[in-house]
């Protein structure tokens, strides 16, 4: 990322956990990562832990059902061909395959522990 590309475009805020981080790009083709095309529109920032311009972190994306901005944390969202916030996953649980339902049940059990 050049100087212009590394400047924050705004602040990403997860509508569930309130994680708040400046982002430098929103979309599917991160700058300087010419061979990478993401499966969803994502809020992205340059990876602060490496000088490599091609490295980036995905902060989150809009839920494909309700459009809430959610982070990629397991407490907030799940990716199954698209990003879904956990409240939508729970609300539409039966619409997901058994493997995803089991994953959701595991997360709920871990949350209670």
Curated annotation (Swiss-Prot):
Any Pfam family matching the protein: C6_DPF
Domain of life: Eukaryota
InterPro entries: CDPF1 (IPR042426), CDPF1_dom (IPR018785)
PANTHER family named in the record: CYSTEINE-RICH DPF MOTIF DOMAIN-CONTAINING PROTEIN 1 (PTHR31849:SF1), CYSTEINE-RICH PDF MOTIF DOMAIN-CONTAINING PROTEIN 1 (PTHR31849)
Family indicated by similarity: Belongs to the CDPF1 family.
Protein name: Cysteine-rich DPF motif domain-containing protein 1
Species, as recorded: Xenopus laevis
